[in-house]
């Protein structure tokens, strides 16, 4: 097993998803594109590919980019649906970073004539929750 495979296989987001202190007091937005997301369809086992678009306004923390890359890559051999993977990534990052705002868009490549786009927005969640 090569070192990269080992890092991905052993990645544990609870301990390995590194966050850093945000040194800036002014509000600013971070936009990250992760074009190589992959996971396995829980029904067929076929691979699913997506581009993840993450944007957030940090409060006290920012995510370390190599750790984020390894976290995203850790899905590549998991049997998980589009909805579950997107929600898990959003929930994990949101709970670790506690940002002022976060939005995750998962743009899955078409497969079987179906194109899936999943968006999770912390402001929308708050609006719906507060009714």
UniProtKB/Swiss-Prot annotation:
EC main group: oxidoreductase
Binding site for substrate: 63-65, 82-83
Pfam families, per database record: QueF (PF14489)
Active site (catalytic residues): 41 (thioimide intermediate), 48 (proton donor)
Primary localization: cytoplasm
GO CC, alphabetical: cytoplasm
Subcellular location: Cytoplasm
Single Gene Ontology MF annotation: preQ1 synthase activity
Protein keywords: Cytoplasm, NADP, Oxidoreductase, Queuosine biosynthesis
Entries under InterPro entries matching the protein: GTP-CH-I_C/QueF (IPR043133), NADPH_dep_7-cyano-7-deazaG_red (IPR050084), QueF (IPR029500), QueF_type1 (IPR016856)
EC number: 1.7.1.13
Pathway stated in the Swiss-Prot or TrEMBL entry: tRNA modification; tRNA-queuosine biosynthesis
An example Gene Ontology biological process: tRNA modification
Swiss-Prot/TrEMBL catalytic activity: 7-aminomethyl-7-carbaguanine + 2 NADP(+) = 7-cyano-7-deazaguanine + 2 NADPH + 3 H(+)
Family: Belongs to the GTP cyclohydrolase I family. QueF type 1 subfamily.
Purpose of the protein: Catalyzes the NADPH-dependent reduction of 7-cyano-7-deazaguanine (preQ0) to 7-aminomethyl-7-deazaguanine (preQ1).
Name assigned to this protein: NADPH-dependent 7-cyano-7-deazaguanine reductase
Gene that specifies this protein: queF
